[in-house]
Amino acid sequence: MMKEVLSTGQGNTEVIHTGTLQRYQSYHIGDFCFQEIEKEIHDIEFQCQEDERNGHEAPMTKIKKLTGSTDQHDHRHAGNKPIKDQLGSSFYSHLPELHIIQIKGKIGNQFEKSTSDAPSVSTSQRISPRPQIHISNNYGNNSPNSSLLPQKQEVYMREKSFQCNESGKAFNCSSLLRKHQIPHLGDKQYKCDVCGKLFNHKQYLTCHCRCHTGEKPYKCNECGKSFSQVSSLTCHRRLHTAVKSHKCNECGKIFGQNSALVIHKAIHTGEKPYKCNECDKAFNQQSNLARHRRIHTGEKPYKCEECDKVFSRKSTLESHKRIHTGEKPYKCKVCDTAFTWNSQLARHKRIHTGEKTYKCNECGKTFSHKSSLVCHHRLHGGEKSYKCKVCDKAFAWNSHLVRHTRIHSGGKPYKCNECGKTFGQNSDLLIHKSIHTGEQPYKYEECEKVFSCGSTLETHKIIHTGEKPYKCKVCDKAFACHSYLAKHTRIHSGEKPYKCNECSKTFRLRSYLASHRRVHSGEKPYKCNECSKTFSQRSYLHCHRRLHSGEKPYKCNECGKTFSHKPSLVHHRRLHTGEKSYKCTVCDKAFVRNSYLARHTRIHTAEKPYKCNECGKAFNQQSQLSLHHRIHAGEKLYKCETCDKVFSRKSHLKRHRRIHPGKKPYKCKVCDKTFGSDSHLKQHTGLHTGEKPYKCNECGKAFSKQSTLIHHQAVHGVGKLD
């Protein structure tokens, strides 16, 4: 077993076995202390490094000092005994065995004679900046200290002869071993004033402080990029030199650094040597383990100077800073849309490619994002882990709970920089911004329709496929989107979670509440580009635009009649089915529409809520007041194509058109008599049925025609109903 004599730095002598760490105390070998030799060798090594960097030769005086200082050292110890008394022979006779050999086989300097006749070193010869110490022992076994210095053995400092008993790691010099052992001893004397983190060495603390200050003193001369640590700069420089000499035998991939190759090999072997003591999770890199530990410790050393938010990773801080700077370095090559983070760009690209790599094992549905698949799995499991503390409603996703809590708090943290409008959800803000920019980056190739947000595009795609995977458990009605199903279930449950702060009225849908709030504010944000008319709801604007375009997309399958609005078609269908869902509580008359019933009840109540500001005349319908206004304005918008006669009301024009031949579409089923208007047919059918729906509130007399009732009421002194 090879042994080596080293200094402890405290006047004692350490003897280290190869492969183990054993400590002995010999204090001194005779009157000669090997601590001094090690110190002098260290001084020469340091001076050689300086001279080599400055291009100077190694001064011989330093080398002479190493061998010549032994005379002075002998007199420091009591008794001034010669070395030969303890070692059995003169130390000087064995000094030629001390060599300084240059690294990597370069020509070096060798001490082969005693200091008394040592020749001067040639100027062509240099001492290596990092010399290796070669010590051979010629002392006999009879020496009192032969147990400390093995016979005919050699020690080379480049060998990793110093091993730590705690971790088993080996080093090629004792100073590195001592530094390594400090963490085992728990000696962390350098503390960060910002976050309180402890360090073994002062230089580690200095490097750590740059995380807080953002200092990057090391700059690349090639590209100007700066780094906080010199090791990072060294690694970066290899990108420019592009030297990749380390090759993986498994896959042939090459690396610029051997350390990178070692890390890469762990992918093939699956080796994860770094294990967390808290949760037993294993990692293939120590840096990954260090990052993971912050989850348990809660340490977040990286702080944003703008908003004071803290992060556990530096990369997360760098990404966060882009929120403040507005930087979007990641750009889509297809549609030029820019993104703050690379992950957003990767997600966005799947819109163009249509890639859906994540598949549900339960129903086979595929998703473009893993997070979407994870969320989808909860639908099958019925898991709802997130519960509202106010109303106890449970949600499958935390994001839905956060969104829901804003209903109770009324919080709207997302603000538009253009108009100052605030929103409860970031997605709503993004959709709103497209109103200002006109941007619609999401296009569907099938119908070439464009959308301002990706979720709307995904919803639209289902229209083409006809897929409706979400089914109501109460009525079995199916829906294309889960959100549609959630809204539908509120019809059965009667839940109305959205409440108006002004009048406390509640609504089933958030959009209904938003529309209702405009009643109080009078806001009409939607404007027609044709006539500049404004509307409180987007749907009203869409319907209005059809007046200009003449578009009537809703068609009746029975008679082929077309309508510009879907509710008009729904109401029209009831004419064919005969369905009259709305019934008067006074006279039991039924109506196709609720608005017709509301209009009808005013006959019984004689209510006339709509009053003309010009002449004071009152009306029981808003439409009648609007038509009446045209009398004062002299406006006549409706013209007969046959005789060019104009009318102020559309109904008057329709009635007039029947004067022209062949315009009596309404036929009596009893006597086949035809009429030009539906109202005339209704009056006529009363003759056959004997029905008298119009009743006088004063005397109770009933009439078959409304006009007859109006004339009758004049007898009682009641003003004519218009």
UniProtKB/Swiss-Prot annotation:
Signal peptide: none annotated. It is found in: Nucleus. PROSITE patterns: ZINC_FINGER_C2H2_1, ZINC_FINGER_C2H2_2. GO terms for biological process: regulation of transcription by RNA polymerase II. A zinc finger (C2H2-type) spans 162-184, 190-212, 218-240, 246-268, 274-296, 302-324, 330-352, 358-380, 386-408, 414-436, 442-464, 470-492, 498-520, 526-548, 554-576, 582-604, 610-632, 638-660, 666-688, 694-716. Its main location: nucleus. One of its GO terms (cellular component) is nucleus. GO terms for molecular function: DNA binding; zinc ion binding. Keywords: DNA-binding, Metal-binding, Nucleus, Repeat, Transcription, Transcription regulation, Zinc, Zinc-finger. InterPro entries: Znf_C2H2_sf (IPR036236), Znf_C2H2_type (IPR013087). It comes from the Eukaryota. Belongs to the krueppel C2H2-type zinc-finger protein family. May be involved in transcriptional regulation. This is Zinc finger protein 600. It comes from Homo sapiens.
